[in-house]
Amino acid sequence: ILFEQPEKLGVVFQEPRLMPWLTLEQNILFGADKKKHSKSKLKEKAETLLRLTGLEKFGKAYPDQLSGGMMQRAALARALACDASYLLMDEPFAALDHFTRQTMQKEFLRICAEEKMGALFVTHSVDEALLLGDEILIMENGKVGSWFTIGENLAYPRDLLSEEMIGIKRKIIKTLENRSQTQKNF
């Protein structure tokens, strides 16, 4: 994947990777262009991102004072601090419990819509891919093996139990099973 402006790419990893000696506000602003913004603009940016991610009361807190979901929100805010147009999300919700994961998925969709940004979201969860993606790519040996278009015709929030979603899920699982069977034969 090539980006015309790689500096506009924000990255959120599976683990938040926050610096424990920095407050949440300092962690969020770590990737911001400090030459481009005055101190007052940076403070305003931090407040905006804290509010956007629902962390406005925790700007002065340190990572060890936060839950896993809160730390992932902070990691998302940090990715947005660099004025990202696109997000690369590498299994950011994999380590979260079911309910926190659901909340983060909804927050992620809301933030992408509000900020009008695109994302490449890596996940091993078929359900998560169906809930969040418009296009689902299944990788095989470092290349795209299969491509499914969910499309924008399925509005958010999506219902995994709808006939249409169940049909798409069956196709994806069948593809994964066939691929798994092929690999076993070698």
Feature annotation, model-predicted:
Residues 25-33, 43, 47, 60, ...:
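Short helical segment in ABC ATPase nucleotide-binding domains corresponding to the A-loop/adjacent helical element
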Residues 81-85:
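A short, proline-enriched helix->beta-strand linker immediately N-terminal to the Walker B motif
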Residues 87-90:
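Catalytic Walker B motif of ABC-type/P-loop ATPase nucleotide-binding domains
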Residues 116-122:
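Conserved H-loop
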